[in-house]
């Protein structure tokens, strides 16, 4: 029996603009298991990115619960939420959001510095991760000196620096060419298998999603289907 890491229970999300209400998510239920690779697919506006943001405490649900390792993420203080984001969750975005004036090594180590990890240890961990993602020779380079695929690899290493339980990735290959996107997806799968970290990946590409352990389809704010993929 698989261990449940994250539970989304009857989550809905709506936005209000005067008398107009826009329903983005409607009573979504799902589970993420420890160490699994889960894809969420759907067209633009289907609600998949909003769901990911709610899972990561970046946006608050209008109704429902989100539990990480049994802890209700929306019944804790904002300080505790920030701690969870830094220690237990990792984030990867379509655009890398690296700090432009810092080297690859410094960018990867930054979340560890924020957590209070000893500087030497944080840099050693960052070096190990950069070597693991194939950038051991590019550690001193700033983002402007790296290719798009290399910058996204730095972002993946940064997401893993604090050994999170779960990494949330929003269109991580959306800004890359096909070859670089393929390499990033293979890297995510490899690291998930090696480190035992769970990944939830939002993507518009069904071919790439089909390589994950499971695939969820979002349509008009509803969870439509769950596809199990043979390993």
Curated annotation (Swiss-Prot):
Molecular function GO terms recorded: ATP binding; ATP hydrolysis activity; transmembrane transporter activity
Keyword Flavoprotein: no
Topology term for the membrane: Peripheral membrane protein
This enzyme's EC code(s): 7.6.2.-
Annotated positions binding ATP: 42-49
GO CC term (a single one): plasma membrane
InterPro entries per UniProt: AAA+_ATPase, ABC_transporter-like_ATP-bd, ABC_transporter-like_CS, ABC_transpr_LolD-like, LolD_lipo_ATP-bd, MacB-like_ATP-bd, P-loop_NTPase
Keywords from the named record: ATP-binding, Cell inner membrane, Cell membrane, Membrane, Nucleotide-binding, Translocase, Transport
PROSITE patterns, per database record: ABC_TRANSPORTER_1, ABC_TRANSPORTER_2, LOLD
Similarity-based family: Belongs to the ABC transporter superfamily. Lipoprotein translocase (TC 3.A.1.125) family.
Subunit structure: The complex is composed of two ATP-binding proteins (LolD) and two transmembrane proteins (LolC and LolE).
Known function: Part of the ABC transporter complex LolCDE involved in the translocation of mature outer membrane-directed lipoproteins, from the inner membrane to the periplasmic chaperone, LolA. Responsible for the formation of the LolA-lipoprotein complex in an ATP-dependent manner.
Listed name of the protein: Lipoprotein-releasing system ATP-binding protein LolD
The species this protein was found in: Shewanella sp. (strain MR-4)
């Amino acid at each position: 029996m698989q261990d449940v890491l994250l539970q989304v229970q009857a989550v809905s999300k709506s936005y209000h603009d005067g008398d107009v209400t826009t329903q983005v998510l409607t009573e979504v239920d799902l589970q993420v298991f420890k160490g699994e690779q889960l894809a969420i697919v759907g067209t633009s506006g289907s609600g998949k990115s909003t769901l990911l943001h709610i899972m990561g405490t970046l946006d608050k649900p209008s109704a429902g619960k989100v539990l990480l390792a049994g802890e209700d993420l929306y019944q804790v203080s904002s300080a505790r939420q920030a701690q969870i984001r830094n220690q237990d969750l990792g984030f990867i975005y379509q655009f890398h959001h690296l700090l432009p004036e810092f080297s690859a090594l410094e960018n990867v180590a930054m979340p560890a510095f924020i957590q209070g990890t000893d500087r030497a240890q944080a840099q050693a961990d960052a070096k190990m991760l950069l070597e693991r993602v194939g950038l051991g020779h590019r550690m001193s380079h700033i983002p402007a000196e790296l290719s798009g695929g290399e910058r996204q690899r730095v972002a993946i290493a940064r997401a893993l620096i604090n050994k999170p339980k779960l990494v949330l990735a929003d269109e991580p290959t959306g800004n890359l060419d096909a070859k670089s996107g393929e390499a990033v997806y293979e890297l995510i799968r490899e690291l998930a298998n090696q480190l035992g970290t769970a990944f939830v990946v939002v993507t518009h590409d069904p071919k790439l999603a089909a390589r994950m352990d499971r695939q969820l389809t979002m349509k008009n704010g509803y969870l439509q289907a769950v596809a199990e993929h043979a390993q």
